[in-house]
Amino acid sequence: MNRQLVQDIINAGNKAMNIVPVKYVIKTKDDKYYCYDGLYYDDNHVEFYDDYDDKISLYYEDIVGIRIGNR
């Protein structure tokens, strides 16, 4: 997925997290991850803890979809 688009979505969700509970859904070709604690990114990848408290690290090209919703 486009790196700038992913970063913009993460920024919006992390800002909203200060006001309302936020849930991220991150989709890859084979998996779907749920995150409730915010996502972190740099120029190469995105990191987060999923709903099983496993640390997940994904390259931008592995992400096929990302969305934000209320818990």
Locate predicted features.
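Short glycine-rich, low-complexity segments
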Residues: M1-K29, I66-N70
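Acidic, low-complexity, intrinsically disordered interaction modules
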Residues: A16-Y59
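Structured surface patches comprising rigid loops and adjacent beta-strands/short helices at the edges
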Residues: L39, L58-R71
